[in-house]
C-alpha cells in the first residue's frame, strides 16, 4: 500500500495532462537548444478531452493545449517534471502570449495504441527535436534530434506495465480497511502530510479566487459553513481551482 501511495501521490502544478504537455515541450526545447519557430503536437483522444478547456497554471488563465505547449517552451524547466511551470515571471507570461500569437502550433489527433500519448516536435529552420511521452505523465519514452534517436525506452503492453507497478489486487475494501487499521503511520506520514498541505492550499485558492463554475463558493454561501458542507465546498473548490 505504501508503494501504491508513492506511485499515485505525485505533486503536479495544476491538472496533470496540460502539465505533461508543458513538460514534453520544455524537454524538446532543451534538446533543440533554441527557441522553435514552429511546433507540431500529436496527441491521443484522452489528451484532447482533458486539456482542451483547462486553465494552464501560471499563464494568466490561458487555456488549452497550445497554451500548455507555449508555457513549457518559454518558461518550462524540464528537470522539474510535473512542476515544470511552477515558477513563471510576469515577463514570461507576456512572452507566452506573444509566442502564441506569432508561432504556429498545430495539433493532430493520433492513436498509436496508448490511451495517454503525447508527441511534441519543435523546429527551428532545418533543425528539429521530438519528444514522446506515453502511458503516464512523466514517462518520456523517446527523444530524437535531426533524425538521431538520443533516447528510447520500449513501451510495454498493459499487462507488463501492471506487473512493473505495485500490486493493485490489494485494492479491495477489506484489505484497505485492514491496512488503515494496522499501518505504521510513520511509513506514510511524510506522504500524507504533504498531501494535506497541497490539498488545503488548492481548496483555499478555489474558495478565494474566481475559478471554473465556483462551485465551492456557491456551496458555502448557499448552504452554510457546517462541517459537512464545508468538506463538500473545499473538495469542489479544489476541483474548481
Segments the model singles out, each with a brief description of its role:
Residues 1, 100-241:
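Signature of multi-pass transmembrane helix bundles
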Residues 1-19, 23, 97-101:
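Short, Gly/Pro- and small/polar-rich lid/capping loops
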Residues 6-15, 49-60, 240-241:
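A short glycine/serine-rich beta->alpha loop
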Residues 10, 86-102, 192-195:
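C-terminal catalytic/substrate-binding lobe primarily of soluble NAD(P)-dependent oxidoreductases
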Residues 11-14, 55, 59, 82-86, ...:
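Hydrophobic alpha-helical scaffolding
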Residues 13, 32-35, 61-62, 110-114, ...:
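Solvent-exposed alpha-helices and their adjacent loops that cap or buttress functional pockets
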Residues 18-34:
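Alpha-helical support elements that line or immediately flank enzyme active sites
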Residues 36-80, 93-105:
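A structural-propensity feature for long, helix-poor, extended segments
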Amino acid at each position: 500500500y505504501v508503494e501504491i501511495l508513492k506511485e499515485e501521490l505525485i505533486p503536479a502544478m495544476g491538472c496533470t495532462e496540460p502539465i505533461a504537455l508543458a513538460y514534453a515541450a520544455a524537454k524538446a526545447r532543451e534538446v533543440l537548444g533554441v527557441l522553435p519557430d514552429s511546433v507540431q503536437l500529436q496527441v491521443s483522444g484522452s489528451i484532447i478531452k482533458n486539456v482542451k478547456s483547462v486553465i494552464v497554471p501560471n499563464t494568466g488563465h490561458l487555456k488549452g493545449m497550445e497554451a500548455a505547449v507555449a508555457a513549457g517552451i518559454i518558461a518550462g524547466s524540464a528537470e522539474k517534471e510535473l512542476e515544470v511551470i511552477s515558477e513563471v515571471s510576469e515577463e514570461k507570461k507576456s512572452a507566452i502570449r506573444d509566442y502564441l500569437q506569432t508561432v504556429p502550433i498545430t495539433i493532430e489527433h493520433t492513436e498509436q495504441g496508448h490511451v495517454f500519448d503525447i508527441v511534441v516536435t519543435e523546429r527551428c529552420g532545418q533543425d528539429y527535436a521530438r519528444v514522446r511521452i506515453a502511458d503516464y505523465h512523466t514517462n518520456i519514452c523517446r527523444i530524437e534530434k535531426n533524425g538521431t534517436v538520443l533516447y528510447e525506452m520500449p513501451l510495454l503492453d498493459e499487462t507488463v506495465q501492471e506487473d512493473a507497478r505495485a500490486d493493485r489486487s490489494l485494492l479491495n475494501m477489506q484489505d484497505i480497511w485492514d491496512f488503515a487499521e494496522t499501518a505504521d503511520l510513520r511509513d506514510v506520514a511524510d506522504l500524507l502530510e504533504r498531501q494535506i498541505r497541497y490539498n488545503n492550499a488548492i481548496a483555499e485558492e478555489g474558495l478565494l479566487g474566481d475559478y471554473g463554475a465556483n462551485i465551492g463558493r456557491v456551496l458555502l454561501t448557499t448552504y452554510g459553513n457546517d462541517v459537512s458542507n464545508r468538506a463538500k465546498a473545499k473538495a469542489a473548490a479544489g476541483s474548481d481551482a
